[in-house]
Regions:
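Hydrophobic anchor at the beta1->P-loop junction of P-loop NTPases
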Residues: 24
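N-terminal pre-Walker A segment at the start of P-loop NTPase domains
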Residues: 1-13
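Accessory nucleic acid-recognition modules appended to NTPase machines
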Residues: 183-357
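Interdomain motor-coupling "hinge/lid" segment immediately C-terminal to the ATP-binding subdomain
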Residues: 113-228
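Conserved lysine of the Walker
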Residues: 32-33
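Domain-level recognition of nuclease-like catalytic cores that cleave nucleotide substrates
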Residues: 401-423
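Conserved catalytic/switch belt of AAA+ P-loop NTPases
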Residues: 85-109, 117
Length: 423
């Protein structure tokens, strides 16, 4: 299968030029190893059955032997021998050079008892996610998020994605292997991913045996509460309405933390701007999966189910947009936050860059009525921001699913279909 360009390619190259070792994190099956292979000049596959036992023994006897090879040297599945971490830190210290090692793993963390140093100053971290629509080829990329931060007077782009396309893309997800397949074969990958998480990965995180039925019920409840600031108690209560087996809030919290560690879920933190008047800002995180297909798979939904329930589709579409915005923001040294205050004023995404610039984004599946509502929300929030203490937003955008064009409204709000957006 031909390698597709990843936005992480440029990020990895940048990090290799500034640090001795880079650890690529992210969910399983998101393409970490394949992306690292493109820039590696030598590779050690720790889990190669032909050499696994030898590799593990050598890691115990003299790990430095495993680090020999042209640089950058990729150490894949390094967590199988956690002592490699300290060996790599030592090599980076003594080589006095950048771009020496790239580490990838299967999303299950290493046993830290054999790791005596944090890696601060020697390692850089790179988080990868499933593919954005631009990376998988469904977005034409005619509108750049980076360009929006320059507040252009005019944007023009044509959107080719229709509602049926979006329903399929939500359920397929951004898994690279799925993106190379068609139809039912592509849709099946998310179901396989969820099964692997439930049956194996959630218990491999920290060696704690977790119940598969409880995990599935928890994921279903999480899917029903995505895009909200639901507390763990709310998620548990939702589980109990559909199952007689009780689970405590503490236990549910430990399950969610395990899912967070293996990048199944990735909540959005609250944005706390300077406002003109005192307004209580809700600080609870907003619940999201790292890819919308996880939620549709765990609920047993397909594209036709979403088309028949556009309210539910809207929730999953929001998760897709947050995924893509995070991929794009990473490339711009940015983060994606969420805003909600006590009066119910909400902003689905705040893209905040390291240099202090930020953009406000509302996600709407489509239709003039919803687009107008989104634009009104953005303008209301922008009017509350104390611009004596912080910058005006660089842009306000309604990110849509349907609609034929990307354009700038008379009030300055951009309307951009997700099928036109890139980093």
């Amino acid at each position: 299968m031909e390698y597709k360009y990843r936005i992480a390619d440029q990020m990895l190259a940048k990090k290799l030029a500034s640090k001795g070792a880079i650890l690529i994190e992210g969910p399983k099956w998101c393409g970490k190893t394949t992306t690292a292979e493109q820039q590696a000049n030598s590779i050690l596959y720790m889990d190669n059955p032909a050499s696994l036992e030898t590799n593990l023994q050598m890691a115990e006897i003299d790990a430095s032997v495993l680090l020999e090879g042209d640089t950058p040297r990729l150490i894949d599945e390094w967590q199988l021998a956690p002592k490699l971490w300290d060996a790599i830190r030592f090599e980076v210290d003594h080589r006095h050079d950048v771009g020496q090692f790239v580490l990838t793993d299967s999303a299950v963390p290493a046993d830290e008892k054999d790791m005596h140093h944090s890696g601060t100053g020697r390692f850089s971290w790179l988080t990868m996610r499933p593919m954005s629509l631009y990376e998988s080829g469904e977005s034409n990329g005619k509108v750049s998020l980076a360009h929006l931060f320059e507040t252009p007077e005019k944007i023009v782009a044509i959107n080719k994605l229709k509602i049926d396309d979006l329903a399929y893309l939500i359920c397929r997800g951004g898994w690279p292997f799925a993106c190379g397949l068609q139809g039912e074969a592509a849709l099946e990958q998310a179901f396989d991913y969820v099964d692997a998480v439930i049956k194996k990965d959630i218990s491999r995180v920290d060696g704690v045996n977790r119940n598969a039925t409880t995990t599935r019920l928890l994921l279903r409840s999480y899917a029903r509460n995505q895009g909200s600031q639901a507390t763990i108690g709310t998620i548990v209560a939702d589980m109990m309405t559909n199952d007689e087996n009780e689970i405590s809030v503490k236990t549910a919290g430990s399950y969610l933390e395990a899912l967070r560690k293996i990048f199944v879920i990735e909540d959005s933190e609250a944005w706390n701007p300077n406002l003109r008047s005192k307004t209580a800002i809700r600080t609870a995180n907003t619940r999201y999966f790292i890819d919308p297909s996880i939620g549709t798979a765990v609920l047993g939904l397909g594209p036709k189910d979403l088309i028949n329930d556009l309210n539910t589709m809207g929730l999953f579409f929001e998760t897709l947009c947050i995924r893509d915005l995070r991929v794009f923001a990473d490339a711009l040294d940015g983060e994606v936050y969420h805003y909600r205050d006590k009066n119910g004023l909400e902003c689905d995404a705040v893209v905040h860059l390291r240099n202090g610039k930020y953009g406000l984004v509302e996600v709407k599946l489509g239709g003039d009525k919803l687009i107008n509502e989104g634009a009104e929300n953005l303008l209301t929030l922008a009017g509350k921001i104390n611009t004596e203490k912080m910058n005006d937003p660089s842009f306000m955008m309604v990110l849509t699913g349907t609609g034929d064009f990307a354009y700038r409204r008379k009030d300055g709000v951009y309307v951009v279909p997700i099928g036109c957006l890139k980093d």
